[in-house]
Amino acid sequence: MEIPHKATVLVIGGGPGGSYTASALAREGIDIVLLEADVFPRFIDLDETFVNYGFVRKNASHGSLADTDFILQPGADTFAWNVVRSECDDLMFKHASNSGARAFDGVKVTAIEFDPLDESAIDDHPGRPVSASWKAKDGRTGSISFDYLVDASGRAGIASTKYLKSRTYNSYLKNVASWGYWRGATPYGVGTSVEGQPYFEALQDGSGWVWFIPLHNGTTSVGVVMNQELATQKKKSSTVTSSRAFYLESVEGARVISQLLQPANLDGEIKQASDWSYNASSYGSPYLRIVGDAGAFIDPYFSSGVHLAVSGGLSAAVSIAASIRGDCPEHTAWQWHSQGVANRYGRFLLVVLGATKQIRARDSPVLNSEGQDGFDDAFAVIRPVIQGTADVQGKVSAREVLDAVTFSTNAVRPSAGGQNVVLEESSRSLRSQVEQEMGDVANSLAKAYKDTDVYEGLMARLERGSLGLKAVGVMG
């Protein structure tokens, strides 16, 4: 099938966010073209595909911060999946095609062309996107015009970085990650009700944390996420020289996980990435929606990336469908999407900041109170954000969401004595700067926070065949 010259909606990027957007809009009978640069090995009815594929179910998560059950209301559907990311992306990409989108992999968008907007437009953007140039891995080139554009291009974020120039970084969450796949690891919680579940553990020196996630193919993903500056300091003082050796040395700093890996062997080479947290001043402009990592990224903690990608993908689809159907003007539709992404990002950022502060504080109380051994009370409050139910209509009340935001805001604000962050002796000079940055972020988010995804009296209408926006209080 040849890449067409015209589409109603062009989606750049076939990851979770882009594939979700494409699936949701294609099911509405809207003409969708989905372009993905790489070649791949509930609303869009993907659940059954994941269930039948054999991914390991993630019923709960446990960690050294607390042996805490993240299930909100136990039941048949209160689980997620531990997935091989490439296989997960492939399933979602194919689902978009099966839903009616014209999907092409191995095709990279190299440039976006814009037309000037009306003089009445006051937003700071290059204009209305009207076409895109592409290049395929086999050497073919071409262009495609469209009415609407969705940028789900991942961290490259072509719209934010190249045209809108709206990306900013959060220096407190400048992390580096390294991970590998192990065979023969002892499952976590053998002989208990949580046997085989993922486990997350803070490093003993407070420099980061380690994940331990069993996969359906018999391997276990083990990754180390570490503050970049602290990682640099540790490498300088370490006796090892290779990245692989430093990864293995770092894993030893997680006592429980290192024990689980005693009988295991590292399968293949380790992988590395810079996990720098960033966000944007807006997540779109007229006829443009920005989704997932293309607009914002926080941290692997609590799997925030996938949730923000999928919820943002649905938000983009809802707002585009609303614009096409005339539910509201386009300037209202794109701003509804942008505000919703900002709200969800803000909620998750506060929770991740609180967890990160607790990791670095080690034994000092951040998410708990003096004398409290665990963090069950804290997670009972922030659970709606971690699970994403804060973004699902009718699942939790606005009061519960607001409580989670308030709790997280208070947790990451600087304490009066400035003693909540405990770092290695070599990095104690970072304390005052870290405290101030976290306080500034918390204050800004708390000030800007809105407890529901309602903009100018509009909320999502999640009905197949009439996807779009409706006035708050209107049935159907």
From Swiss-Prot:
It holds the Pfam family FAD_binding_3. Its EC number is 1.14.19.-. It is an enzyme of class 1 (oxidoreductase). Chloride binds at residues 304-305. Keywords: FAD, Flavoprotein, Monooxygenase, Oxidoreductase. FAD binds at residues 14, 17, 306. GO terms for molecular function: catalytic activity; FAD binding; flavin-dependent halogenase activity; monooxygenase activity. Pathway: Mycotoxin biosynthesis. GO terms for biological process: ochratoxin A biosynthetic process. It catalyses: ochratoxin B + FADH2 + chloride + O2 = ochratoxin A + FAD + 2 H2O. Induction: Expression is positively regulated by the ochratoxin cluster transcription factor otaR1, probably via its binding to the conserved 5'-ACGT-3' bZIP binding motifs found in multiple copies (3 to 4) in the promoters of the OTA biosynthetic genes. Expression is induced by sucrose, glucose and arabinose which repress the gal4 transcription factor, a negative regulator of the ochratoxin gene cluster. Flavin-dependent halogenase; part of the gene cluster that mediates the biosynthesis of ochratoxin A (OTA), a mycotoxin composed of a chlorinated type I polyketide dihydroisocoumarin moiety linked to L-phenylalanine, and demonstrated to have nephrotoxic, immunotoxic, genotoxic, neurotoxic, and teratogenic properties. Belongs to the flavin-dependent halogenase family. This is Flavin-dependent halogenase otaD. It comes from Aspergillus niger (strain ATCC MYA-4892 / CBS 513.88 / FGSC A1513).
